[in-house]
Amino acid sequence: MPRSHDPSRVELLRKEGGLTEKRVSISVEDIRGAVANWKNSGGAGDPITPYPLPQFFLQPPSTAGGGSRNGVGSKEGSVTSLRMPLKKAGDDVDLGHRGELDLSEKYNYDLSRAQLKASSRTSALLAGFAMVCLVELQYDQSTPKPLLIVLGVVTSLLVSVHLLALMMSTCILPYMEATGCTQDSPHIKLKFYIDLSWLFSTCIGLLLFLVEIGVIFYVKFTAVGYPTAGYITTAMLVPVGVVFVVFSYLIHKNRVSHSLGRFKHKVDTMKQFLDVEANLQKSTLAPSTIRDI
């Protein structure tokens, strides 16, 4: 293949003597001759051409490396563009995988968090109500002293139980929300305190609240000289307390039975799946054993 010769281009190159970059024209014959000379010389010594051969490097269209926008890339940019960007000293440290919980453990995490939130709200409301009742009630000289002692004891127990539940919920809940649904969550080892907070807030605290209402009725109606109204209101609160206990038992029983039923259904489904798989394996092994015989 002959070398292309353009007289006008040659004259233009001669006039541009101030160019710092040397321009060359390379043909296929030059490259073949250079390769032949290099093979004859044994591949060692000085460079085979008096001029540098052009080198081209592929660079993928990625901004992760050091590539330029004009499409002309360097070897260094093409290599670094395929790598992950390096983190600087000021970047945040990647903590990696912290151990995500499975579905059953995630359910326990969500349940514990919901229990703590409900306990904190209920305990704060009822404890504040009991303190307001104790302060705002007006006591007379005619109020029986044993009734005042009962009121003070019930109010102290009510506030103490709800404050304990509030303290446990406010101490555990922030750490649960900070760690998230991972194995670092404290609800796994602090399950006893979560259940205790739920028991204080919903069961014992609500029963003491009903007793508190009955004692307040006695104090108010005795102050006006009409204790019969206190007897009537207390008689109305007794069936309410019984219904409260019965409903709590029924709800707990139905919840446990539902959980056990779901567990039994999952076990039966898994057993059927394993039986079907075992039957399929037997059916595939039977013809081979017959052929061997």
Swiss-Prot record:
Cytoplasmic side residue ranges read 1-122, 168-198, 252-293
Keywords per UniProt = Membrane, Transmembrane, Transmembrane helix
Q: Which residues lie on this side of the membrane: Extracellular?
A: 142-146, 220-230
Q: Name one GO cellular component term.
A: apical plasma membrane
* Tissue spec. comment: Expressed in gonad sheath cells, hypodermis, intestine and spermatheca. Coexpressed with stim-1.
An annotated GO BP? store-operated calcium entry
Q: What happens when the gene is disrupted?
A: Worms exhibit an inhibition of intestinal Ca(2+) release activated Ca(2+) channel activity but has no effect on the initiation of posterior body wall muscle contraction, intestinal Ca(2+) oscillations or intestinal ER Ca(2+) store homeostasis. Attenuation also affects sterility and brood size.
Q: Which InterPro entries match?
A: CRAC_channel, Orai_sf
Superkingdom is Eukaryota
> What does this protein do, in the record's words?
Ca(2+) release-activated Ca(2+)-like (CRAC-like) channel subunit which mediates Ca(2+) influx and increase in Ca(2+)-selective current by synergy with the Ca(2+) sensor, stim-1. Required for Ca(2+) and IP3-dependent contractile activity of sheath cells and the spermatheca. Affects brood size and somatic cell function.
Designated name of the protein: Protein orai
Originating species: Caenorhabditis elegans
Name of the gene: orai-1
